[in-house]
Design a protein with these regions (language model features):
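Active-site-proximal cap/loop segments of hydrolase catalytic domains
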Residues: 1-7, 13-213
């Protein structure tokens, strides 16, 4: 946020439902709301800033990491006219994959606990499968209108790189623009200083190209 503010951008970091530190009710209000009410919280925040005269509604980009990467992709699918570009960092692209990919560290150590957690917070693979498909960005890539920058660690064990590759391939098949940045030897986040610097350089260049301050 400080980097983007330093480059002249207004930055919104909403505590959408499910954010920690706001009590049980706030947390539970996010259950089975990926791409739904959780996504609407972000959209409502943008509309509030627009109403306050802080943000030009025609010059908004969305970006984030992990769940924020998912929210980026889902925002581009759900509100394609709202955003000029998106930056998905180690983001989830398919809610079914998130549960079925056995090589994610989230569900490989204690599969039974992971299954129960996902069934409560994201949706049950059987009972809620149609909902999970509906709110998986990879399955609706044709709705995306804005260019996307993907940033991922090749060795990500939390959100395997297949999520980025799957969304990239779906965008390519739909004729949609994207940029691609993968760091070898990195996981669910970037630890090497040279990689962090390159990430910031690419993010700044991408934003200046598609949504200059």
């Amino acid at each position: 946020a400080q980097f983007l503010a330093n480059r002249g951008y207004a930055v919104l970091q909403p505590n959408f439902r499910g954010s920690t530190g706001f009590g049980r009710k706030h947390l539970q209000s996010s259950f089975k709301q990926w791409g739904q009410a959780m996504q609407d919280d972000i959209t409502d925040g943008i509309r509030h800033l627009v109403a306050q005269g802080i943000v030009d509604p025609q010059r908004v980009c969305i970006g984030g990491g992990s769940y924020g990467g998912y929210a980026t992709l889902m925002g581009l699918v759900k509100d394609p006219k709202q955003y000029r570009c998106g930056i998905s960092v180690v983001g989830v692209s398919d809610l079914i994959w998130m549960q079925e990919l056995g090589y994610s560290d989230f569900n490989s150590y204690r599969p039974d606990a992971a299954d129960a957690f996902f069934a409560i917070t994201m949706g049950d693979l059987k009972a809620d499968r149609a909902m999970l498909e509906q709110y998986s960005p990879r399955r609706h890539a044709d709705k995306v209108q804005a260019p996307v920058l993907f940033v991922h660690g090749a060795d990500d064990k939390r959100v395997p790189i297949k999520h980025a590759e799957g969304m990239r391939d779906a965008l390519k098949a739909a004729g949609k623009p994207f940029d691609w940045l993968v760091f070898s030897g990195e996981g669910h986040g970037f630890l090497k200083p040279e990689n962090r610097l390159e990430y910031f350089r690419r993010m700044e260049a991408f934003l200046r190209q598609h949504n200059p301050p």
